[in-house]
Amino acid sequence: MNKLKVTLLASSVVLAATLLSACGSNQSSSTSTKKLKAGNFDVAYQNPDKAIKGGNLKVAYQSDSPMKAQWLSGLSNDATFATMSGPGGGQDGLFFTDSGFKFIKGGAADVALDKESKTATITLRKDLKWSDGSEVTAKDYEFTYETIANPAYGSDRWTDSLANIVGLSDYHTGKAKTISGITFPDGENGKVIKVQFKEMKPGMTQSGNGYFLETVAPYQYLKDVAPKDLASSPKTTTKPLVTGPFKPENVVAGESIKYVPNPYYWGEKPKLNSITYEVVSTAKSVAALSSSKYDIINGMVSSQYKQVKNLKGYKVLGQQAMYISLMYYNLGHYDAKNSINVQDRKTPLQDQNVRQAIGYARNVAEVDNKFSNGLSTPANSLIPPIFKQFTSSSVKGYEKQDLDKANKLLDEDGWKLNKSTGYREKDGKELSLVYAARVGDANAETIAQNYIQQWKKIGVKVSLYNGKLMEFNSWVDHMTTPPGANDWDITDGSWSLASEPSQQDLFSAAAPYNFGHFNDSEITKDLNDIDSAKSENPTYRKAAFVKYQEDMNKKAYVIPTNFMLNYTPVNKRVVGMTLDYGAMNTWSEIGVSSAKLATK
């Protein structure tokens, strides 16, 4: 699996679903004969024919923005590329997991946790090598921490969770030149790393927990590149080293990756001779499938489902998404020097009643019914239903439009309706807000304009940012560049979530991805409680998650929008295709049953 903690998404509602990868993510497991279902979808395709020797798999990721190739996970935040990097190792993930996202043995590395000593010991495989044949070493694991914690590299993945590693905060702030809590029992060139924590956390047994990293970076290959140049270096963009079953032979900036087998891969040798992975636009994807151009397309959105569900030559697979879309309010800025969100913006949105009212005014269910083809449902909280052990139907959010309640909240807050304009005013100022909606599928502008009309019904004047939708990469830069822009009030976002559902990395006081920059002591307490020693008790942890969801809905710093089912069309010549989250070798095992794509 792709072990990024959280990933910005680039289609659907606003940031779109990473869908893991059409073929599992990093390395997906032995093809299962189990008949797994997600909703009405099969999770795996059982091709009755056997794979031929060799062949080229043709894969695409749907996006209306160019991919941003970055092979170091700590410097990457593009969902399109996160998925497209899968055949090469998913930006070099290390660990295998079961279908419940718990670590298991057998991957590129194993991890052993010790509660008494408060340590994690990572042991790399002896035969783990980079695609140039050089050894993957303990230093390569530690170097990934450097790229995130050293501000000179420009990573935006520093979080409170990582600060739980002894000495990492001092390294991050420049007080120390090395990371005291990461040591090498067999030396930097060995295969063992010990990570010392301040506290053990209940989520540490889960992949994506954020408390320790799950990737490596080729230190010897990169050590001579200046930190400020690393993100743009060909060594991390077009000519990388990888550890997966395939290696990139050719990377065309923004467009495509050609993969060939990695002769130094430690695991099962791939069945395919090559994989071509391209970006395809929303406008062209359905036609591309109709003409049998691709075996698989990732990232297709719900509004396209009716057009592809009965295409000849294809089987549509599905899976519950580790996904949440939401609405953000701009409440402050990010202090990069001190790694803290500061909630100091002068805006009517500082008032909880205003935030709640705007949330209640949206007609999310109506939008879903019209555009999602049954694949999206209004979200009652920020935790998707795939994590059912941490959710409760008792949590009530903003899934049902309630204009009466919205109007009442604004009335209580002193916002008076000016009958001549149709908009509310207070202290001589109109309630006027800027909506930074962004380009998505063909319905994106229709949906944005719909919400603007709903807000008008409660007397809130909302206009699009610069009068139009924002291009995705421009939107990302606008939201992620510290200290954060002051020229927007509302935006939408969606995330491919980690397989450990704690949301420290999204909404903690230190999280750069806390786009609205709220900083609330009660929410901080809730997040810390979820990850406390008490939460090693599953019943306690569920209660902590439920309280967090209730408090977030009440305070309305962000408003949950949708949960999703992912779907992926797969050509019927493909063998070994599964979306099972517990699959760990799919890129090696996937093949094709004929040289040409199936057409019926």
Swiss-Prot record:
Annotated compartments: Cell membrane
Lipidation (N-palmitoyl cysteine): C23
Gene null: resulting phenotype: Mutant grows only on di- and tripeptides and is unable to transport the pentapeptide Leu-enkephalin.
Membrane topology: Lipid-anchor
SUPFAM superfamilies attached to this UniProt entry: Periplasmic binding protein-like II
InterPro entries in the cross-refs: Peptide/Ni-bd, SBP_5, SBP_5_CS, SBP_5_dom
Keyword Chaperone found: no
A cellular component term, taken from the record's GO annotations: ATP-binding cassette (ABC) transporter complex
Position of the signal peptide: 1-22
Lipid-anchored residues (S-diacylglycerol cysteine): C23
GO biological processes: peptide transport; protein transport
Major localization listed first in the record, in broad terms: membrane
CDD domains in UniProt: PBP2_Lactococcal_OppA_like (cd08510)
GO molecular function: peptide transmembrane transporter activity
Keywords: Cell membrane, Lipoprotein, Membrane, Palmitate, Peptide transport, Protein transport, Signal, Transport
Keyword Transit peptide assigned: no
Biological role stated in the UniProt entry: Part of the ABC transporter complex OppABCDF involved in the uptake of oligopeptides. Essential for uptake of peptides larger than three amino acids and for growth in milk.
Complex formation: The complex is composed of two ATP-binding proteins (OppD and OppF), two transmembrane proteins (OppB and OppC) and a solute-binding protein (OppA).
Family named by the database record: Belongs to the bacterial solute-binding protein 5 family.
Name the record gives this protein: Oligopeptide-binding protein OppA
UniProt source species: Lactococcus lactis subsp. lactis
Organism classification: Bacteria, Bacillati, Bacillota, Bacilli, Lactobacillales
Gene (name only): oppA
